[in-house]
Amino acid sequence: MAGHSKWANIKHKKAAADAKRGKIWTRLIKEITVAAKLGGGDPDSNPRLRLSMDKAMDANMPKDNIQRAIQRGVGGLEGVNYEEIRYEGYGLSGAAIIVDCLTDNRTRTVAEVRHAFSKHGGNMGTEGSVAFMFTHCGQFLFAPGTPEDKLMDAALEAGADDVVTNEDGSIEVTCPPNDFSAVKAALEAAGFKAEVADVVMKPQNEVDFTGDDAVKMQKLLDALENLDDVQEVFTNAVIEE
């Protein structure tokens, strides 16, 4: 990826998410509930629950809210039943987009996602149409200036798959999804706290957008991210700042 893009794009996405803190809490409560429902209420034996709890704590969510979501998931409290749905589609220039949702009404969600695609110059694809262009992995991004050799040693010892230094000086570490929490803990114990850390669908190749096309593509991504049922949006589009 071009040096200007990796750090700027991921930091921009994080800032935009932080600006919608209230919505972030709503999404995280849904994710914690579903994670507990599918894998049980013990984060030590449920990596997905551990990740969602870590995100909630990073977002300053009160512990009571987190515990209520877990209880709802394991059946201790009444609540809405959510199902996971993934939609795939295309933006401008055939850029690939994955939209992960948690919903209590599949009909409503697919209509809203399809409308967002069509309104902003994209189109829905079929299941599997773009997912093969991404790799499911844990991803950590460290700021330019992080000592590369020490980070690489710590990351590989922790079980990371790869460590890449981008042209802009930022360093990216990837690992298997199920090892995310262990790698994160090991890196932090070694003194390395990532600016951004998450389990993602990482694009294998990227499409650069500049000028008017960048503006249009960003509007499509924003429209999808702003839908209530949408949890995550992944794309291989790189938007020029």
Curated annotation (Swiss-Prot):
Q: What molecular function does GO assign, one term?
A: DNA binding
Protein name per the record: Probable transcriptional regulatory protein Reut_A2522
Q: Which PANTHER family match?
A: TRANSCRIPTIONAL REGULATORY PROTEIN YEBC-RELATED (PTHR12532:SF6), TRANSLATIONAL ACTIVATOR OF CYTOCHROME C OXIDASE 1 (PTHR12532)
The record's similarity note reads: Belongs to the TACO1 family.
Q: Where in the cell is it found?
A: Cytoplasm
The domain of life for this entry's organism is Bacteria
- GO cellular component, as recorded: cytosol
Organism of origin:
Cupriavidus pinatubonensis (strain JMP 134 / LMG 1197)
What are the record keywords, sorted? Cytoplasm, DNA-binding, Transcription, Transcription regulation
Primary location class: cytoplasm
Enumerate the Pfam families for this protein: TACO1_YebC_N (PF20772), Transcrip_reg (PF01709)
Where is coiled-coil annotated? none
**Amino-acid biosynthesis as UniProt keyword:** no
Q: Which InterPro entries does the record cross-reference, listed alphabetically? A: Integrase-like_N (IPR017856), TACO1_YebC-like_2nd/3rd_dom (IPR048300), TACO1_YebC_N (IPR049083), Transcrip_reg_TACO1-like (IPR002876), Transcrip_reg_TACO1-like_dom3 (IPR026564), YebC-like (IPR029072)
Q: Which cysteines are joined by disulfide bonds?
A: none
One annotated GO biological process: regulation of DNA-templated transcription
The UniProt entry, under SUPFAM superfamilies, shows:
YebC-like
